[in-house]
Amino acid sequence: MANFKHKDIIALQDLTKQEIELLLSTAESMREINNRDIKKVPTLRGKTIVNLFYESSTRTRTSFELAAKRLSADTVNISPSTSSATKGETLADTALNLLAMKPDIIVMRHSVSGSHYFLSKKLPCSIVNAGDGVHEHPSQGLLDMLTMKDRFGRLDGLKVAIVGDISHSRVARSNIQGLTKLGSQVFLAGPPTMMPPGVERLGNVTVCDSLREAIQDADVVMMLRIQQERQGKTLMPNAREYARYFGLNPENLKLAKPDAMVMHPGPINRGVEMASSVVDGDQSWILKQVENGVAVRMSMLYHVCEGELE
């Protein structure tokens, strides 16, 4: 398997098209391991992976932990509520204390955008980004692309509509970076107060005035969660108004292609971003996204650790 040139995986912006394709290809191989009766290989035996989550997480933290264990790595989970961060310890000091434990990889989620680059300069071990502020969420972007590839067999030429709170979405940024590098056309829609200025500069991106315009003839419709916790003040009148103009329901979904897939990074606000009938409908690939998360994160850990795949 080809070598991966990076010590860290912090942003899809930092990776080439070929490197993203390599991570996706390896993830496809990792799925074979996940389908075995005994879901474990000795690839990262003897390696130590620290999961350092400064923000709450269920799917991402559990998925990274499961990925590490299936590759036979030792894992340590640290959360702010049980760490010295609650006593005022800085990220730099936390990093130096962790370094004394000699980890091979630190998987971190942090509320500050760019914090992983700071950590990478401080530490010789690999840093894997599990989400930083509103910057990027590379593992989510990769698993989303893998899920699209499962459905269509390709990414090149797909029309992907991303709808919702673009300004505060690290998921949107990672998807934009990855999808445009691999040849997809990305169409964005959301309330004007939730659309970052200059987003078109990120790649082959078109900003639309409405959900209906964005999802017209789309192959993929990706809905994003409204992130009130990242907003200094409310940026929408109320949930009912948001659902009226930017919520996905069975009627407006008909504007997309008949075989379009529906995605959401979770957690979902049913009845706001999407009607429950769409979440649970035949076009929903949301649970497949969760399933693909383990394989993608196995691929990321494997490549930064240069493991031997068996």
From Swiss-Prot:
Binding site for carbamoyl phosphate: 59-60, 109, 137, 140, 266-267
Annotated GO biological process: 'de novo' pyrimidine nucleobase biosynthetic process; 'de novo' UMP biosynthetic process; amino acid metabolic process
Superkingdom, natural source: Bacteria
Pathway membership, UniProt: Pyrimidine metabolism; UMP biosynthesis via de novo pathway; (S)-dihydroorotate from bicarbonate: step 2/3
Matches recorded under Pfam families: OTCace, OTCace_N
Binding site residues for L-aspartate: 87, 170, 225
Catalyzed reactions: carbamoyl phosphate + L-aspartate = N-carbamoyl-L-aspartate + phosphate + H(+)
Gene3D superfamilies: Aspartate/ornithine carbamoyltransferase (3.40.50.1370)
GO cellular component: cytosol
The enzyme's E.C. designation: 2.1.3.2
Any GO molecular function: amino acid binding
The entry's keywords: Pyrimidine biosynthesis, Transferase
Disulphide bonds in the chain: none
Chain's role: Catalyzes the condensation of carbamoyl phosphate and aspartate to form carbamoyl aspartate and inorganic phosphate, the committed step in the de novo pyrimidine nucleotide biosynthesis pathway.
Subunit annotation: Heterododecamer (2C3:3R2) of six catalytic PyrB chains organized as two trimers (C3), and six regulatory PyrI chains organized as three dimers (R2).
PANTHER family for the chain: ASPARTATE CARBAMOYLTRANSFERASE, ORNITHINE CARBAMOYLTRANSFERASE, MITOCHONDRIAL
Recorded family membership: Belongs to the aspartate/ornithine carbamoyltransferase superfamily. ATCase family.
UniProt-recorded name of the protein: Aspartate carbamoyltransferase catalytic subunit
Species this protein is from: Pelobacter propionicus (strain DSM 2379 / NBRC 103807 / OttBd1)
